[in-house]
């Protein structure tokens, strides 16, 4: 039996040796290789995880940066929109303010127009009245000048200075002139006292013209009488 066992053991050993020889690798070496493979795979797994984590972190950081960049333009757009709305609100407010001064400017202009119209309306009646007054005063002055210039009183006053013998005729001329001149003076006084109306001025002008026309024949007759008396006085002196 023992011999059989020895023989079998030898055979087994021989078989193992043959296998080792065939493989050329010992089991220890196989185990070491397997351990190294396991370690390498584990290390690779760890490195992969690290790389994935880094990639995830990088991706998250990139996403955060992208989100920030996206949010920044959005915030700028919102700010610009807010500024635009405030500017538009301020623009109508400022636009309404100039409108109010414009309205306020329109009211003084309207007031000025009303004052100008009232002034023109007042000046329009005053201008004809003043022109009528001037015309009436000019007519009265012309009438008084004509009456005073044509009155025989001045001539009667000059005649006594030149010729003394005519003193007898002078009082009659003076009395006649005194009788005529008060009428002209009364007419002139009435013309000045009466208001400057068209009817009053026309009537006064007609009265003055009639008074002047009445005085002119009398004065011409007196002048003719004075001329006739002058040769008689010259003959007496001669």
Swiss-Prot record:
Ranges of biased composition (kind: Basic and acidic residues): 9-32, 54-83, 97-116, 155-167, 213-225
Membrane-topology annotation of the record: Peripheral membrane protein
InterPro entries the UniProt entry points to: IQ_motif_EF-hand-BS (IPR000048), Neuromodulin (IPR001422), Neuromodulin_C (IPR017454), Neuromodulin_gap-junction_N (IPR018947), Neuromodulin_P_site (IPR033137), Neuromodulin_palmitoyl_site (IPR018243)
Acidic residues composition bias: residue spans: 226-238
One of the GO biological process terms: axon choice point recognition
Modified-residue entries (Phosphothreonine), positions: 181
Sites of S-palmitoyl cysteine lipidation: 3-4
UniProt KW keywords: Calmodulin-binding, Cell membrane, Cell projection, Cytoplasm, Developmental protein, Differentiation, Growth regulation, Lipoprotein, Membrane, Neurogenesis, Palmitate, Phosphoprotein, Synapse
Annotated Polar residues bias: 139-154
SMART domains from the UniProt entry: IQ (SM00015)
IQ domain span: 31-60
Region spans: Disordered: 1-238
Biased composition (Low complexity): 84-95, 119-130, 168-199
Example of a GO MF term: phosphatidylinositol phosphate binding
Transmembrane segments: none
Pfam families assigned: IQ, Neuromodulin, Neuromodulin_N
Residue(s) carrying Phosphoserine: 41, 151, 153-154, 202-203
Post-translational modification, as annotated: Phosphorylated. Phosphorylation of this protein by a protein kinase C is specifically correlated with certain forms of synaptic plasticity.
GO cellular component: cytoplasm; dendrite; filopodium membrane; growth cone membrane; perikaryon; postsynaptic density
Domain of life: Eukaryota
Subcellular location as annotated: Cell membrane; Cell projection, Growth cone membrane; Synapse; Cell projection, Filopodium membrane
Physiological role: This protein is associated with nerve growth. It is a major component of the motile 'growth cones' that form the tips of elongating axons. Plays a role in axonal and dendritic filopodia induction.
Subunit structure comment from the entry: Identified in a complex containing FGFR4, NCAM1, CDH2, PLCG1, FRS2, SRC, SHC1, GAP43 and CTTN. Interacts (via IQ domain) with calmodulin. Binds calmodulin with a greater affinity in the absence of Ca(2+) than in its presence.
Family assignment from sequence similarity: Belongs to the neuromodulin family.
Protein name: Neuromodulin
């Amino acid at each position: 039996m023992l011999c059989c066992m020895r023989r079998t053991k030898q055979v087994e050993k021989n078989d193992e040796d043959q296998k080792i020889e065939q493989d050329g690798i010992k089991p220890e070496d196989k185990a070491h290789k397997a351990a190294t493979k396991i370690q390498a795979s584990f290390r690779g797994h760890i490195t992969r995880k690290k790389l994935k984590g880094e990639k995830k972190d990088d991706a998250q950081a990139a996403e955060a940066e992208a989100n920030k960049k996206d949010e920044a333009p959005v915030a700028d757009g919102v700010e610009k929109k807010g500024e635009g709305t405030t500017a538009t609100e301020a623009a109508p407010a400022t636009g309404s303010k100039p409108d109010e001064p414009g309205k306020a400017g329109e009211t003084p202009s309207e007031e000025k127009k009303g004052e100008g119209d009232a002034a023109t309306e007042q000046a329009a009646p005053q201008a004809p009245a003043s022109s009528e007054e001037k015309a009436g005063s000019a007519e009265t002055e012309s009438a008084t000048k004509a009456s005073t210039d044509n009155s025989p009183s001045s001539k009667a006053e000059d005649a006594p200075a030149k010729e003394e013998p005519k003193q007898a005729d002078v009082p009659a001329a003076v009395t006649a002139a005194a009788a005529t001149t008060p009428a002209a003076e009364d007419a002139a006084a009435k013309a000045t006292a009466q208001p400057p109306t068209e009817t009053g001025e026309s009537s006064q002008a007609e009265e003055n013209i009639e008074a002047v026309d009445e005085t002119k024949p009398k004065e011409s007759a007196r002048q003719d009488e004075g001329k006739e008396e002058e040769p008689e006085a010259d003959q007496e002196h001669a």
